Each structure stands twice: as structure tokens, then as C-alpha cells.
Amino acid sequence: MDNFLNDSKLMEDCKSRQWLLSGESPAISSVMFSAGVLGNLIALALLARRWRGDTGCSAGSRTSISLFHVLVTELVLTDLLGTCLISPVVLASYSRNQTLVALAPESHACTYFAFTMTFFSLATMLMLFAMALERYLSIGYPYFYRRHLSRRGGLAVLPVIYGASLLFCSLPLLNYGEYVQYCPGTWCFIRHGRTAYLQLYATMLLLLIVAVLACNISVILNLIRMHRRSRRSRCGLSGSSLRGPGSRRRGERTSMAEETDHLILLAIMTITFAICSLPFTIFAYMDETSSLKEKWDLRALRFLSVNSIIDPWVFAILRPPVLRLMRSVLCCRTSLRTQEAQQTSCSTQSSASKQTDLCGQL
């Protein structure tokens, strides 16, 4: 009982605190801000170079920018915008030694921070879902994908996602849910326990993560089927004297390699977001009277913020040579087994075809 009263007093003190306690350091926030801005700028520079290469391509040549890369560009822009709009408020709080509640009249800085934090976290997850859905349709329904989806349509995804995130995250401004300040006074978020809005927000993130994982699993299964079909076709054609379809087979292998690269990139981003969202989900579903809740407050926010820092670095690090290396490592054992099985199968088919020819001559 005493612990509950002490936690309640601490929570109330955090909500109304005007000054930061001595010993609070902006080091972690500064490092996160610098890493986020630098990573997003590097990712944007790499994407800009790819866009410039795409505009220089002739009409008959193969373009280098796909719908997937349009969505990646929008994700990086979202992460950069979120970092630049959120982190400076925290750094201003440290520089003035004031909490967010005291930083602006009527707690406007606290409301601004909480709204932008919820908005960009949801927008990021929706962008990852759009990328996963694009991969799912590209592999599972190629005819529908080529007929109805285009790069121009991808440009409309960002305003749609921003509009949906704006509507959902504005509910506390319409008195459903409430934004409050949390310890140590340098961040604000949805109030725990007043309404079910915090749990609703966490549930939406969980559902999006599950949907992204389901799309990725479906893409993996479809890629396995494509690999098996291409293996059979190569085996069937190896015993014949026809060489015409060689360029088509090379195109199929290139397409499969690109799809695998996109899947690796998307899978790592999804796993990163799932890990970064886990502390927040635990915090959202904790009992308000739990003595552990106070320890999870700042930890949950920092984990949620780290995602926008990691995403651009994932894209910047996983360049095509690195993706090819990862693909070769992941597929090494499978490739060895496939080659052995293919050689056995092809030799069997070749001997069978020879026997058929001999029978025809007799």
C-alpha cells in the first residue's frame, strides 16, 4: 500500500514538475538526434543518386526506381521529419533546465511533443505495412500489381497515411484520451489509465506488426515456389538442345534476386520496429498501480524513438553488395543441396531421354 501511494505521488509530481532535477544529462538525447539526422541524410543521398540515375535512363531501358523504392523514400522522409520536429523540443528543455510543461504556456510544448510522437510512430508503422503489402501483391498477384499499381500511385501513399495518422492521433485533442508529462519531465505521451486510448494505440501497432509479418511470410513462401519452378524449368531445358529461353531465365533469376533483396531489407526493418515497440506495448498494458510502470516510462519512449534512427542506417548499410552477401550466406546450404538434387534429377532425365531415342531408332 505504501509503495502504491509513493508511486502515485511520484506520478503526480512528474505531471506538474516545472524544473528538471539536478544530474539530468542531455547526452543520450543529443546522440539519438545526431544519429537520426545523419542516418536519414545519408539514406536520402543514396536514394537521390538512384532517382537521378532513373531520370537518366532511356525509355527502353530498365528503370532503377521501383514502387518499393518510392515507399522507402517516403519512409526515410517520415523518419527525418519526425526526428527534426521532436528532438529539438527535448534539447530545448535540457538547455533551459525546464520541463515540457513549463517550456510553453498552457503546456503547449507537452501537447506538441506527445502528438508528434504518436503521429510519427503510427505513420512509420503504416509505411512499413504499405511496403509489406506492396511486396505481397508484387509476388502473389503480379498481374493485378502491374495493372493497377504504379510509382505515381506510390506518391499518393504518403498523404493518405499522414491523413489517417492525423485523424487517429487527434483524438486526445478532442477529449478522448489525454496527454500528460512523464518523468523526468523531458517527454509527454498518452496518459495511462484515464481512457482506453493508450491500449487502443498499442493494439493498432501490434495489429500492424502482425499484418506485416503475415505479408512477409507469404512473400517468403511465394519466393520458395518461384525458386522450385525455376529449378524445374532449368532442369528440363538442360537436357534439350534449345538455348533460346536463356535470356528469359536470366531475367527470372535477376527478378528473384531483387525480390529477395527487398524482402531482406523489409524484414530487418520490421523486426527492428517490433523490438522497439515491445517495451511500449508492455507499458501500455501494464496495470496503472504496478510498481514497475515508472521504470518502463522513459525506457519505452526511447525504444520507440530508436526505430526512426535505425531504419535509415539499415537502408544505408544494406547496399546491393551487402545484400548479395547476405543472400549468398542465407542460401548457401540450400544452393548446395539444390545443385546436388538438380544434377541427380537432370542426369536421370537425360538418361531417360537417351533411352527413348534409342528405342525410337530400334
UniProtKB/Swiss-Prot annotation:
Transmembrane segments: 25-48, 67-92, 113-133, 153-177, 200-224, 263-286, 300-323
UniProt-listed GO biological process terms: adenylate cyclase-activating G protein-coupled receptor signaling pathway; cellular response to prostaglandin E stimulus; positive regulation of gastric mucosal blood circulation; regulation of cell population proliferation; response to lipopolysaccharide; response to nematode; response to progesterone
GO annotations of cellular component type: plasma membrane
InterPro entries, sorted: GPCR_Rhodpsn (IPR000276), GPCR_Rhodpsn_7TM (IPR017452), Prostanoid_rcpt (IPR008365), Prostglndn_EP2_rcpt (IPR001923)
Residues of this chain annotated as glycosylated in UniProt: 6
Functional description taken from the UniProt entry: Receptor for prostaglandin E2 (PGE2). The activity of this receptor is mediated by G(s) proteins that stimulate adenylate cyclase. The subsequent raise in intracellular cAMP is responsible for the relaxing effect of this receptor on smooth muscle.
The protein, known as: Prostaglandin E2 receptor EP2 subtype
Species, as recorded: Mus musculus (Mouse)
Gene symbol of the encoding locus: Ptger2
